[in-house]
Every structure is written in structure tokens, then in C-alpha cells.
Amino acid sequence: MCIFVDMLIDTHCHLYDEAFRDDFEAVLARAREAGVEACVMPGIDRSCHDALLAVADALPDFAFPCIGLHPTSVGTDWEEELAFVKAHLADQHWYAVGEIGLDGYWSKDFLKEQIRVLEEQIVLAADAGLPVIIHLREATEDFFRVLEDLRGVVLRGVMHAYSGSYETYRRLLTYADFKFGIGGVVTYKNAGVASALEKMSLDDVVVETDCPWLTPVPFRGRRNEPSYVRFAAGKIAQIKDLPLDSVAAATTENARRLFKL
């Protein structure tokens, strides 16, 4: 399937990852050829900080940096990692606090600490007037408890790699101005999010890759890259029975407004 459009924004792209070291310029060329006009780059932890900033500095009109502590990086040194985020939040212009959230899939050993770290980073984002990028996996009710505890905080952001139900989508919108990141998973056979996406408003959707991971069909099993965001957009268009250009235009505008690009 050949899919090319005039404009797309990849709202979740780890372009600084070592997976792109050997062919970085070719990856960029393919992204631009595919109509990708910008990539939002979430942080993970302090280990990737310098690499992320190097890409952002090299591509100031294309790669937009974010800072945050990923839930799977919350371990015995979580206090030092969180202090790093706090110390560097005022260093430069960030476009979001993220990737932050809760992950109970790999381990629940540090879930209590994940919750503490998430709460503090949500408040940091609100105080800085920044959106959040939320990673949520097998900890949905814990996340809702966090949202309930922070009811007074003005919150906006992206539910990254959204794979929940329509009911969960509606429930999340009662707490915050969330957009919902749709990526390669939507192209997989029996992807559960497809039924929710049918009923979701396109005004609430952004597209993403999470590259180098979560590669869409027809390239599943290989390294993901920003140019492949077009396959997520194409699948959204198919599911919602809309022209691809309409999906591209709407999701791009949603991303621009959220991240103030």
C-alpha cells in the first residue's frame, strides 16, 4: 500500500535512539518524502538526555524535545531521576513533560513509586503550562485514582499508544483535555482499539509511531521509523471512512495546538 500525504506530525518518536545511528539522514529523508513535517520526541530518563538534545539542536524545526521520567525507568534511584527532571525543566523550551505514566506489565515492584513520580510530574507540567505524554499499561484504575487525586490540576496531553475502549476514552475526557495517540498497533489484526476509534472524535486523535518500536503492518517485525506514521493515518481513514487527507489535516492541527508547534 503506497500512502503519501502533504502533512503529518509524528507525536511520539524516539529519533535519538541508537537504532537510527547508522542511517539517520536516510530516515529523515524518507520521513520528509512521506509528508512528515515534525516529530515530537519524548524523554525516557537521564541516560538519553544528551542524545535527545543533540537531535533537537540539529533539527530545530523538525524534532521537538520533551523531558520526563518513563515509568519503567522508576527503580531504586527514582529520586535521583526525578530530581534530574526537576533540575532541567527550566533549562530550555520543552514541548511536553513525558514520557510519564504507569506500567504494571513488566513489573509491579515499583508501582507505588511510579504513582508518586507520575503525580509529581503532572504537577510540574501544569505549573509549567506544558502538556503531558502518558504511557499507561496494565494500570488503568491506578491512573484514574491519580487523576481523581489531582482533580484541581488543569491537565492536557496525549494518551500515548492508546489501546483502550470507547468507554475508557469517554471517562478519561472527564478528567483532562486528552488527545489519543494512534500508532502502528491499529494496523495489527484484531487490534482492539479499532472498535473504539470508530466512535472517537477525530478532534481527539493524533498519530504517532513510537519508533523504533511498534512497527505497523506491512513492516511489522522491522525497525519502525517516522515515515511509517502514514500507515497509522491510513488505517484511521479506513476505519472512520474518511479521506486520508482529512485525517492528516485534522491530526496535524490537533498536534500543533496541543504542543504549540
Role assignments for model-derived ranges:
Residues C2-L261:
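Mid-domain alpha/beta scaffold segments of enzyme catalytic cores
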